[in-house]
Amino acid sequence: MSDIKLDRCDVVDYVKNTLDNSKTNFDHVTGAKYHHNTKYCDASSVIRFGILTMSELNKLKLRHDSPESLKVMNDTLSQVNGLNGVSLAVTGLDDLYPDEDEFDPISASFVDFRVSDTISPRPGRNSTKYGNEFIYPGVVRPEEFRAIDIRILEYIEQLENNVSNMGSRSIEELKNNYNNLLDMLKVLKDANLDIPVRETFGGFSIDKEKMSECPRIVIK
C-alpha cells in the first residue's frame, strides 16, 4: 500500500473526496440487532479473529494483562463480561427502567460491528451497567458479522462545526482512523469476507475493492 503526503490543512478534503469516490449503494441489512463498538485501531484485529473475550485476547498475546488484573476482570460485578464473555448492545428497547442508563453504539469515533440476531448460544441480558447490554458467552466469530458501520463523515462534520476543534490532535485522529479503515478493507479483501462496510452518517456503502487500493495518508 502506497502513501500520499498531505499538508495538515488538506486532510479533511482528501478524506471526504476519497469516501465520495468510493461510495456505492447503501447495503440494507436485516437480522443484525446486536452492536459491538471498537476503536478504529483494533478493528482489523476484530475482522481477523472475531470479537474476543479477555481470556482469548491474552491467550493470543493481543493483550498482556497480569494475573492480578485478570483476577479483577473475572469479577463480573466490576466487569460484567468477565474473562469469558463479550459485551453487545441492542438499541430501541422500550422496557428499560427509569434509573437504567442506555448505551448508544452510534458514535463518530468508533467502528460498530453489527452482529447476527441468530448467534448461538443466545446472548443474555445484563443490566448491571447498561439496561440494553447483552453478554455473549464466548468469541463472536467474523461469520456472525452482518455489517461494519463507520461514521467518519460525522466526525468531520463535528470538526467543521467547531473550528476550534480542528487542531493537530483532531486531524491526526482523522488521519489515523482513515488509515485504519484502509487496513480493515485490506483484511476483508485478503480474507475474502463479504461483509458490507457502511458509512452510515453519509448513507452509503463503500466499494471495498476500490478504496482498499487508495494510499495511506502521511502528514507532511
Task: Please state what every model-predicted region is.
Residues 1-220:
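NAD-dependent ADP-ribosyltransferases
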